[in-house]
Amino acid sequence: MGNKENVLAIIEQTKVISIIRGVKETYAARLIDALLDGGIRCLEITLNTPGALNIIKEARKREGIVVGAGTVLSLEDTQKALEAGAQFILSPERE
């Protein structure tokens, strides 16, 4: 199974994506571990959270987790998020 299929399989299995928004970077690792302990394996880190790219990198250190970037507003943000390890991208509607 390829990366895309793995990501989709985990999302389908868990049926829950936890959104991490506005969490201080210093608390991110503990929050991620607590979510994993509670069975949450799919996370979206919003890019309007200070240190979001570092939080994505931190989350990706764990096994069996899917990590995405949310509130992505530009191609540049998309590239940075993917470089940080995001496995999916979410963007709000924009006119």
Walk through the language-model features, giving the residues of each.
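Conserved N-terminal beta1-alpha1 strand-loop-helix module at the mouth
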Residues: M1-A84
